[in-house]
Amino acid sequence: MSNCCRILWIAIVIGLGVLYYEITKEFPKPNIPLDTWWGTGKSQKIDTSMRPFKIAINDEVLNTLKVKLSDVSFTPPLEGIDFQYGFNTNTLKKLVDFWRTQYNWREREALLNKYPHFKTNIQGLDIHYVHIKPQVSKNIHVLPMIMVHGWPGSFVEFYKIIPMLTTPRTDYNFVFELILPSIPGYGFSQAAAKPGLGATQIAVIMHNLMDRIGFKKYYVQGGDWGSRIVSAMSTLFPENVLGHHSNLCFLNTLSSNIKSFVGSLFPEWFAGKQNVHKIYPLSEHFFTLLEESGYFHIQATKPDTVGVALRDSPAGLAAYILEKFSTGTNKAWRSAKDGNLQSKFTFTELLDNVMIYYVTGSITTSMRIYAESYSWDHLSLNMDRVPTIVPTACAKFPHEIAYKTDFQLAEKYKTLLQSTIMPRGGHFAALEEPLLLAEDIFSAVKKFIDHHSKKDSKNQENRDL
């Protein structure tokens, strides 16, 4: 081999090595200020008390809603089209009629007020949360856990799972004390007055909330945007987060995407026989993503424009939100005239969530999380490439919008203790399959406890040497 060839091969090897390093290198934990002021004007002294709060919507708001629901015109759907073009207006008419004539907000309001609600000011924003303290005997351990919702959800998604997580069981010696916040700009939580409040900055607010309540160490759980927020909490505050459970474990790195491409050569080996269809063929999943992500592009670029229409029209708001509850639960439901919405949910349950957006006028501010979290400033934090050492568990529901193998997730989550392939369910797990989700949370937290116990024992042994 000539010297030129040797030099060329050496250059190629070095180049590939540098490329591999750049693609796979881990980033340091970013320095996110803990006291950024997100309220109006300049930072000022705040009331740090935790104020009891009760949902009590003005009659005028409800009367206006009824008037608007009585004056809706519907464009007929195309022949042979179900939910493929979005929310079928024949189904929407039935929903609006139910909303106007049968849905009773005052009854639902009383149900929502069943658990104690509070507000407290964090970094200039009044943050709303529900706080559930279980009543148990002394031999049952009570573990604090924050559960964070996403879009287009709200804290009401968790109401079914509350008793499952707070009631003592014979197979575990612990239950959970739950903190269910509304993300800033959602529902009864105040929206930021300044740009820049992305998922990572919200994670700081949620950590400060837990600290304000009195929890120095706690567990986290989330799906959708909640999954991104609690993942960031685990990454930024490993000394405080005891365990991280998510029903949407996801990362979007160049190296993980390359693995998906290379894995297409050996799909069953890469994904496992039962999970191949969740990733491959790549082209099919790409076009599905393209078809279903139109809302994402709007909300990541011009959320305030579409927000004007959605805030003004309750029927439009319901269609926009509940179309996601159909497709997000099972994308095959696009081929059903009613979107199969009532096969897993009731109209009442679905409208409870829509009402949180309507009565608070928060649809515009809720959508801004997309623009803030996909800004260049936020993306430059490279949170997906900052390692998370906190014990982690992933519940993988079969109809979730995205799927990553444990091999890919291990890039970020260095202590992945549990990964469960669920038998059924989709994106809105807490509302759709609360029992499955609760079982997985209990199982995961038991593993987290055992992990910390072994770690503490090992540290003690090292100290004794």
Swiss-Prot record:
Cellular compartments per GO CC: endoplasmic reticulum membrane
InterPro entries linked: AB_hydrolase_fold, Epox_hydrolase-like, Epoxide_hydro_N, Epoxide_hydrolase
Protein's name in the database: Juvenile hormone epoxide hydrolase 2
E.C. numbers: 3.3.2.9
Keywords of the record: Aromatic hydrocarbons catabolism, Endoplasmic reticulum, Hydrolase, Membrane, Microsome, Transmembrane, Transmembrane helix
Subcellular localization, as worded in the UniProt entry: Microsome membrane; Endoplasmic reticulum membrane
Membrane topology value: Single-pass membrane protein
Organism lineage string: Eukaryota, Metazoa, Ecdysozoa, Arthropoda, Hexapoda
Gene Ontology terms, MF aspect: cis-stilbene-oxide hydrolase activity
GO biological process terms, semicolon-separated: catabolic process; epoxide metabolic process
Highest taxon of the lineage: Eukaryota
Family, per entry: Belongs to the peptidase S33 family.
Segments crossing the lipid bilayer: 7-27
